[in-house]
């Protein structure tokens, strides 16, 4: 169905969604993600002749930032926002951008889409890992991060480099780099670790590195913070809304390898106060990523729209 819609401008899925809406007659339709869900739902609403349900549009990740750069996508995003009753996102950045594209909808409270996570409350163990998110694609650039960190060589001491959620290019690059340098580099292919196992990995990590050309808040970064790892994240995400640069973590420009290496060294050599940063990050997580608090915010989305109907 999705393949057909690539050629039929989302009308196939749109017709199916319209049929389901007529059958269930919901008060509110909430779409999570602009493209696959949003574009097709826009078509569905065009097909609905009678009274339509209220529509909430939630941006995922860096969708609105990245795709609004392209005229065809920007036009589709505008058409979707034009029929929305409510809009939500993970980042203040995204609300500001959405307001430049369209208006008339209700800006709902900012909320991370992942649903939250309780901060780590167990006893601190040994943190002897530098963990890198292993995506290598149009947006994720794990190989560059790996080359930068591994380039520190003996200055890493006994720290282990770990890459998780790796795709094939990252697995190959890590294997070749380990062979040529003799460094121990541990990799986990995408899907090899459960969510709980990833959290355990973060608990034993001193540093989390995220290197991408575009992102939302970076759920992985926030989860790493919740588990006590110090975040080192590119400024193409909304990291600035969660991390105070050089105080609670480090924010750097993509491909600025010197800045990435400097951040890693500051942390592992003790120039950076990791203990104080960790305490502040735990407070941020408890305030803004607590699942109970986020559940109340989510419920408020629907209450506010039904009350104003």
Each predicted region: which residue ranges?
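Short N-terminal targeting/anchoring amphipathic segment
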Residues: 17-37
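Donor nucleotide-sugar binding/catalytic pocket of nucleotide-sugar-dependent glycosyltransferases
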Residues: 57, 82-121
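Conserved donor-binding/catalytic core segment of Leloir-type glycosyltransferases
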Residues: 88, 122-153, 162-165
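Nucleotide-activated donor-binding/catalytic signature segment of Leloir-type glycosyltransferases, i.e.
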Residues: 172-192
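Aromatic "clamp/platform" in nucleotide-sugar-dependent glycosyltransferases that forms part
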Residues: 213
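Short hydrophobic beta-strand element within catalytic cores of glycosyltransferases
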Residues: 230-233
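Conserved acidic donor-binding segment of nucleotide-sugar-dependent glycosyltransferases
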Residues: 245-246, 250-258, 266-272
